[in-house]
Regions:
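Generic structural signal for small/hydrophobic residues in well-ordered secondary structure
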Residues: 15-17, 79, 109, 165, ...
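Conserved sequence/active-site signature of Rossmann-fold short-chain dehydrogenase/reductase
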Residues: 130-131, 183-185, 225, 254
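Short, solvent-exposed loop/turn segments at secondary-structure boundaries
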Residues: 93-94, 150, 187-190, 293-295
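N-terminal Rossmann-like NAD(P)+-binding domain of SDR-like oxidoreductases, especially those catalyzing
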Residues: 1-181, 325, 340-341, 345-347
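Short aromatic-enriched loop/helix-cap "lid" or pocket-rim segments at secondary-structure transitions
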Residues: 45-48, 134-137, 188-192, 222-223, ...
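C-terminal substrate-binding subdomain of Rossmann-fold SDR/epimerase-dehydratase oxidoreductases
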Residues: 29-32, 202-348
C-alpha cells in the first residue's frame, strides 16, 4: 500500500501545520522526497524535528513569484495543498486576510502550475463545510456548494477556482479536491478549536469555553483523513484522470456526534489516563455563539469507499482514545508519539 510514493518528489504547501506535519512525517516513512512551503514553523512540526529532515521554503503563499520559484526548483511529481487560514472565528475578525491566504494563495499555486508546467498531480484540500446547508443527513460530492460563513465561502471559492483552472488551462494536469471532516489527533495547538482548547485547559487544570454544545460534526481521526489523501494520490499516479474531481473523506455516521458528546467522552478518558476525579477541574462553560455555524454537518464518503477502497479504521471511541493518549504522553512524559501512532495505524 502507498508504494508509489517511494522516491517521488512531494511538495506540501502548509507542511508545518497540524495536518501538514503528520502528512510530512508519514511520507518520509514511505521514502518520498518531501519538500515544504510554509510561512512559519508550528509546534508539532518543531517537536518532530522535521525541519532537519525536510527542506522547507519559508515564504508567503500570497507571493506568486516565490510560489513559481519553488515549483520550478523542486519540480514535484505531486503537490498536496494544505495551506490555509483554517479558523472560522478568525475569518470574521479578519476576512480580508482569510481570503488573501485561502483564495489568492490557491490561485497563485494554480497559476504557478500553469506557467511552470509542473506538477503531474495536484491535490487541493478544502473542507466539509463547502456544502450548501440544506438540512441533509449527509452531503455527497454532487450536492450544491454554498458557504454561509466567511471561512466556508473562501473554501467554496477554492473549489470553483480549481475547477475553472482545470477546464481552462490544465487539461493535461491531474487535479482533485479533498473535502474532509473535523480532523482531530495529537499535536494540534490551533486557536479556537475544540480539542486544542480542551487540552490546554486540562493541562492547566482550568475549565474551557465550549460553544454550540449540541451541534453535530463528522469527527475524523487525523490518520484516517490523511490515508484518504494518500490513497487518492496513489490512484492518480496509477490510473490517471478517472480519479480527478472532488472527494469526501469522512467518518461513519456513528462517529458524527455533538461537541458535548465528544467533550464528555474525552473527559472520561482523560480522567482514566490521569487517575483524577472528574470534578477536580475538568469541565467547561458554555460560550454564547457570536457567528453562524451549521447545526448538523455530515458527509457521505461512499465514492471513496467504492472507488478507492478507503474507509476509516477508527471509530469515534478509538479516535478519542488515540488523541487523548497522544496529549497524555506529551503533558505527562514529555514524549512525542506521532511516529509510533503512524506505525501502529499501518498495522491495523
Amino acid at each position: 500500500m502507498l508504494d508509489n510514493y517511494k522516491n517521488k518528489k512531494v511538495l506540501i504547501f502548509g507542511n508545518t501545520g497540524f495536518k501538514g506535519s503528520w502528512l510530512t512525517l508519514w511520507l518520509t516513512t514511505l521514502n518520498a522526497n518531501v519538500f515544504g512551503y510554509s510561512h512559519k514553523m508550528y509546534p508539532h512540526y518543531e517537536l518532530l524535528n522535521l525541519n532537519n529532515k525536510v527542506k522547507t521554503y519559508f515564504y508567503d503563499v500570497r507571493n506568486l513569484e516565490k510560489v513559481k520559484e519553488v515549483i520550478k526548483e523542486v519540480k514535484p511529481d505531486i503537490i498536496f495543498d494544505l495551506h490555509a487560514q483554517p479558523i472560522v472565528s478568525l475569518s470574521y475578525s479578519d476576512p480580508v486576510e482569510t481570503y488573501e491566504i485561502n483564495v489568492i494563495g490557491t490561485l497563485n499555486i494554480l497559476e504557478a502550475i500553469r506557467t511552470c508546467h509542473q506538477p503531474y498531480i495536484s491535490l487541493f484540500i478544502t473542507t466539509d463545510k463547502v456544502y450548501l446547508d440544506q438540512g441533509h443527513l449527509s452531503y455527497r460530492e454532487s450536492d450544491e456548494l454554498g458557504g454561509y460563513d466567511l471561512y466556508a465561502c473562501s473554501k467554496v471559492c477554492i473549489e470553483n477556482i480549481v475547477n475553472s483552472y482545470k477546464k481552462s488551462f490544465l487539461d493535461n494536469i491531474l487535479i482533485a479536491t479533498c473535502r474532509s471532516g473535523n480532523c482531530i489527533g495529537g499535536g494540534d495547538w490551533g486557536v479556537d478549536r475544540l480539542i486544542p482548547d480542551m487540552m490546554r485547559a486540562f493541562s492547566k487544570k482550568e475549565k474551557f469555553k465550549l460553544r454550540n454544545p449540541h451541534y453535530v460534526r463528522p469527527w475524523s481521526y487525523i490518520l484516517d483523513t490523511l490515508s484518504g489523501y494518500l490513497m487518492l494520490g496513489e490512484n492518480l499516479f496509477q490510473k490517471g484522470n478517472e480519479y480527478e474531481g472532488a472527494w469526501n473523506f469522512g467518518p461513519d455516521v456513528s462517529s458524527c456526534i455533538s461537541t458535548h458528546e465528544i467533550v464528555n467522552q474525552s473527559i472520561n478518558y482523560w480522567s482514566d489516563l490521569k487517575s483524577i476525579q472528574k470534578n477536580d477541574y475538568l469541565g467547561y462553560d458554555i460560550q454564547k455563539p457570536v457567528f453562524h455555524e451549521t447545526k448538523i454537518l455530515m458527509i457521505d464518503s461512499t465514492k471513496a469507499r467504492v472507488l478507492l477502497g478507503w474507509s476509516p479504521k477508527f471509530d469515534i471511541g478509538d479516535t478519542i482514545i488515540e488523541t487523548m493518549y497522544w496529549y497524555k504522553q506529551f503533558y505527562t512524559n514529555n514524549k512525542i508519539i506521532t511516529l509510533d501512532q503512524i506505525y501502529e495505524y499501518n498495522k491495523r
